[in-house]
A protein has these predicted regions:
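Conserved N-terminal catalytic core of the sugar/cofactor nucleotidyltransferase
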Residues: 36-100, 112
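Short aromatic/basic micro-patch
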Residues: 28, 108, 151-152, 183, ...
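Short beta-strand segments
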Residues: 12-14, 53, 102-103, 134-138, ...
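Conserved alpha/beta core of the MobA/IspD/sugar-nucleotide pyrophosphorylase nucleotidyltransferase superfamily
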Residues: 2-5, 159, 165-212
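A short acidic, helix-capping loop that chelates divalent metal ions and anchors anionic groups
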Residues: 18-22, 142-143, 192
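Conserved beta-loop-beta/alpha segment of the NTase-like Rossmann-fold superfamily
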Residues: 75-155, 159-162
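N-terminal glycine-rich phosphate-binding loop and ensuing alpha1 helix
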Residues: 2-57
Length: 212
């Protein structure tokens, strides 16, 4: 049983942005590079540490300019990004009881939502060492919520996160252990939206401006 939660965060920034046409994390969003939104969302004292894992030297330079820890690599798989990020965090913080994985392209995700997820995790982990948390939001009139990232794994899953199948991410474990997955529900489904295309980015940017 864990006495308290010490959680790290891996910012997933290794994608090739093939549908976007260029590195979307560097694309302007509301006057700043898109990745800055992930920096803001994870700038919380509830996280013990965070690191950006990327294959882009430009992203690396951006992180260094903002004082955000970054790991540059050249490996192809999503499993590589997970393994490298978690390993880097544990090298500096071996006491971590959980790790959150967040894609860098969810610009409407708020820090308050990240804090909500971290708080729910900390409360649940007092009772069990094997738990997975993800975000969920209302899906229109359907009975089942939309679900998405970030996803937070307790340290009981770290060994399996280090040995994920080639090219696969942590979602493998959500399918493997459905009874251990908890969903932290939020009111705004747009916080789960990503920006795979320039059109999607423009739509989310318009929503930000509309809300002021």
């Amino acid at each position: 049983m864990q006495m308290h939660a010490s959680t790290g965060c891996v910012l997933m920034a290794s994608g090739l942005s093939t549908r976007f046409g260029s590195n979307k994390l560097l694309a302007p969003f509301d006057g700043q590079p898109l990745l800055y939104r992930a920096f803001a969302a994870t700038d919380t004292p509830q996280l013990s540490a965070r690191i950006v894992v990327t294959r882009s030297a430009q992203v690396q330079a951006l992180c260094k300019a903002q004082g955000v820890p970054v790991l540059l690599h050249a490996l192809p798989g999503r499993n590589d990004t997970v393994r490298l990020g978690l390993s880097a965090l544990l090298a500096q913080h071996p006491e971590l009881t959980g790790c959150m994985f967040l894609p860098g392209d969810q610009p409407l995700l708020r820090r308050a939502t990240v804090d909500q997820l971290l708080t729910a995790f900390a409360q649940t982990q007092k009772e069990t060492e094997r738990v997975i948390f993800r975000l969920g939001a209302p899906a229109g009139n359907g009975p089942d919520p939309l679900v998405g990232s970030p996803v937070l794994f307790s340290n009981g899953f770290f060994p399996e996160l280090f040995t994920l199948p080639e090219g696969k991410g942590g979602s493998v474990l959500l399918h493997k252990y459905p009874t251990l997955v908890h969903t932290a529900c939020i009111a705004q489904p747009e916080e789960l939206a990503d920006t795979d295309t320039p059109a999607a980015l423009a739509q989310l940017e318009a929503l930000v401006r509309e809300k002021g």
